[in-house]
A protein has these predicted regions:
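Conserved donor-nucleotide/metal-binding helix-loop-beta segment in metal-dependent transferases, i.e.
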Residues: 143-193, 528-578
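A short acidic (Asp/Glu
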Residues: 65-67, 88-90, 147-150, 267-268, ...
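Catalytic metal- and UDP-sugar-binding loop of GT-A-like glycosyltransferases, i.e.
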Residues: 137-141, 522
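Active-site-proximal specificity loops/subdomain of glycosyltransferases
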Residues: 85-133, 148-159, 469-555, 561
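Short, flexible loop/turn elements at secondary-structure junctions
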Residues: 58-60, 257-262, 444-446, 523-526, ...
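C-terminal catalytic/acceptor-binding lobe
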Residues: 2-12, 25-37, 43-44, 190, ...
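N-terminal anchoring/stem segment of glycosyltransferases
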Residues: 11-12, 16-103, 379-518
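Basic/polar, acidic-poor N-terminal "presequence/leader" segments
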Residues: 30-60, 181-214, 420-434, 439-441, ...
């Protein structure tokens, strides 16, 4: 066969609605009779083979290169242009130029095309739909991205990330580190001030998003203030942000992924570009309020860098009243249906004084029915599982590192706080951390220990670029951080039952998807020789050695170790292994097929590793207040930790067991440390060495520094070595 496009209703194949059975869609006609056009390169191309399409708008932004959209041959690329252009990069079997004349010729019997008076990207959408598209990416040439598939996680049915449901509007540019930048629609709606984000969010497992919105910097996507310019760069954090029902979002921040059920919402009115995008933003806002669609932002990396538009003031066309209008739109139907959708679209058109476009709406809905669209009108669900509150301030930290005066202020503030412990502390230096590829997770067991955070900041910011704290109460932390002026600190609530399940803190950290090679968790009372850890292999697990081995199934009512016979001990680990065994031999029912298969293969890997390391009838346990998980094991660790947490297995059992299930023990780095008990805890300096061990635990700061000897140890011995070694490491960078 030859490369070409399917002629829908050309001279060779005339299709009449009257002569067509109501049950026979256009796609079915294609299946029975496909007519192809042969272009000059004679390559085979049948559009209906593709289920995922990228529609590139070359009408509002001229296109000279679409190579950035063609990284994956599973996507068809249709470039919508007004007239033929010389586009050399659109030369593969998966790319086609679709001109206005081709649209009228090939789709001219569709009522939407008849209603159009000028070229429109609706032509590209319809071409994709009639050829059986299940996913459509709406893109433009000013933001060509490298990897559509992985950036938007199109192949996954679930993803992890953040859920935002706090303020009336969400500014994605602010979330990714730009305080004076906002989407074009917010300028039109005079909403630059109300779009200030809250830092309180939730770490969550996100359901499949109906609409996925890319966020990238370009003149088409954002506006920045002339009087307060900032660097046009987004912080390198990839976690998607799902938006709650009542929060306004922008559809003008980059490419948009529409899944099949959201195809009706792709309608654009015949109007100027900014009114088109404002219409789409407001329509999605109403549909989201009615819980018909769910929505998430994804940071995308354009192939070529760009900048925002710079404006002296807010937009000259203040339409803030429009938002009040659309917020009043309601649907009285108990069940969402096509009639409800029509009335909602009509309501948004009326709010924008575009009521004359009602005919286009009727044409669009008629064509969707004619094409054979069978989307679901069921209401979309918001995240409800595994919600853990987070005070998310990585963006503030990112901005602080680019602002010398703010950085100096925070450094001075932290140093001053630390002077309460050490009378003459060295000035804190946060400007050039030596470890930039590890996220440090610091455990704060009790609310009363939040006062140790300034000490943690003073010590660990010298080494680590990324730090997150995990403790029992988000509300208490926010109150404390406001009082202590620690607005750059990120904190997640993960201690739902004291310290017993604190291994889930790393799970939360992994779901944030920072650009790191691994995740190191430690308690606030662990004294660590970080300079010795910096050289360890970052593709291996690190965990303290020296485990106690025991028979998993042996019952001992006289057991001396209290936790073994408690609900978080033997019972929990036995139940976890029962689940693993069941999952390894069959695909579980009651979940999505993709997740069930993922669980099945994970269980097989876990049990295979565990059997070779120890044998499936035994477990090991020990205190694990310091450990590291490489990012290459991220997915397996998340599944393992959630499984053992589900069965309420405490950390001293769960983590040693998990590490044997994730990796062969030959590929594990076992840390050397001093674990202190009883009176030894009063004199930790007698067990400390700056070269032979990785850590000492516990070292209770307030208790140790109550004595002159203890204060000298912390302030003179330990910290002087800590600072010296950080400078040595920095010179090696």
């Amino acid at each position: 066969m030859a490369l070409g496009v399917i002629i829908l209703l050309g001279q060779q194949f005339f299709l009449s609605r009257k002569s067509m059975s109501p049950r026979r869609s256009i796609q079915q006609v294609y299946d029975s009779q496909v007519i192809e056009v042969t272009p000059t390169d004679n390559k085979t191309f049948v559009l209906r083979e593709f289920k995922k399409w990228i529609v590139v708008d070359a009408l509002t932004t001229p296109c000279d290169d679409v190579a950035g959209f063609m990284q994956n041959d599973q996507w068809a690329v249709v470039v919508v242009t007004e007239s033929p252009v010389d586009l050399q990069t659109c030369n593969s079997p998966g790319c086609i130029l679709f001109t206005w004349e081709m649209c009228k010729r090939d789709l001219g019997r569709l009522e939407t095309v008849q209603a159009l008076t000028q070229p429109s990207t609706l032509c590209g959408y319809l071409l994709a739909m009639v050829n059986g598209a299940k996913v459509i990416a709406d893109a433009s040439c000013d933001v060509p991205i490298r990897d559509m598939e992985n950036t938007f996680e199109v192949s996954e049915d679930k993803s992890s990330g953040l859920w935002y449901n706090t303020t009336s509007a969400f500014n994605p540019f602010e979330h990714w580190g730009l305080t004076n930048t906002y989407p074009h629609e917010y300028e039109l709606l005079n909403m630059s001030a109300p779009s200030v984000n809250s830092h309180v969010m939730y770490v969550s497992d996100l359901s499949s998003m109906t609409i996925k919105q890319g966020v990238a910097i370009s003149k088409k996507t954002c506006v920045t203030n002339l009087y307060n310019p900032e660097k046009s760069s987004l912080m390198p954090v990839n976690s998607p942000v799902a938006i709650g029902a009542n929060t306004l979002v922008s559809l003008q921040t980059g490419p948009t992924i529409f899944t099949y059920d959201s195809f009706p919402s792709m309608l654009l009115p015949r109007s100027e570009t900014r009114d088109q995008m404002l219409f789409r933003t407001l329509l999605i806002h109403v549909l989201k309020k009615m819980k018909v669609v769910n929505f998430a932002y994804y940071k995308v990396d354009p192939k070529t860098p760009s900048k925002c538009d710079v404006h002296e003031s807010a937009g000259d066309k203040d339409q803030s009243f429009v938002l009040q209008c659309v917020n009043s739109i309601e649907c009285d139907a108990n069940v969402w249906d096509e009639t409800c959708l029509r009335n909602t679209v009509l309501g948004v058109l009326e709010c924008l004084n575009l009521g004359s476009e009602a005919w286009l709406l009727n044409a669009w809905m008629t064509d969707l029915d004619f094409i054979g669209f069978k989307g679901s009108y069921e209401k979309a669900s918001e995240p409800t599982r595994n919600l853990f509150g987070i005070s998310y301030n990585f963006n503030k930290e990112f901005m602080m590192m680019q602002n010398n005066s703010e950085l100096a202020r925070v450094e001075q503030h932290i140093t001053k706080n630390f002077s309460r412990i050490c009378s003459s502390p060295l000035k804190q230096s946060m400007w050039e951390p030596v470890i930039t590829d590890i996220l440090l997770v610091v455990i704060i067991n009790y609310e009363t220990l939040y006062s140790t955070i300034p000490y943690m900041e003073y010590v660990h910011r010298r080494y680590f670029k990324y730090i997150m704290y995990c403790g029992p109460s988000l509300d208490s932390f926010v109150k404390y951080s406001d009082q202590a002026d620690l607005g750059h600190v990120t904190f997640v609530s993960g201690m739902t039952r004291s310290w017993l399940f604190m291994y889930e803190c790393v799970t939360h950290a992994m779901k944030l998807r920072l650009p790191v090679k691994g995740y190191m968790q430690m308690g606030e009372d662990v004294l660590v020789n970080t300079w010795l850890l910096a050289s360890l292999p970052k593709d291996q697990i690190w965990i303290p050695g020296g485990f106690t081995k025991r028979d998993m199934y042996k019952i001992n009512k006289l057991e001396k170790w209290y936790h073994w016979n408690s609900p978080v001990g033997q019972r929990g680990v036995i139940n976890a292994f029962a689940t693993l065994t069941n999952s390894s031999v069959s695909v579980p029912d009651g979940t999505s097929r993709a997740f069930a298969l993922k669980s099945h293969y994970f269980a097989k890997r876990f049990l295979s590793n565990y059997k070779s390391n120890l044998g499936v009838n035994y477990i090991i346990h020990r205190a694990t207040d310091l450990f590291y998980i490489p990012d290459v094991l991220r997915d397996d660790y998340i599944m393992a930790s959630e499984l053992f947490r589900q069965h309420e297995t405490m950390i001293e059992i769960a983590l040693p067991v998990i590490h044997y299930g994730l990796s062969n023990r030959k590929n594990v780095t076992y840390l050397k440390g001093a674990s202190l008990w009883a009176q030894d805890r009063l004199r930790p300096w007698t067990y400390y060495h700056d070269t032979g061990i990785h850590f000492v635990h516990p070292v209770k700061l307030k208790m140790v520094t109550n004595s002159t000897e203890g204060k000298d140890f912390i302030c003179e011995t330990y910290l002087s070595k800590y600072v010296k070694e950080s400078d040595v490491l920095r010179l090696k960078l």
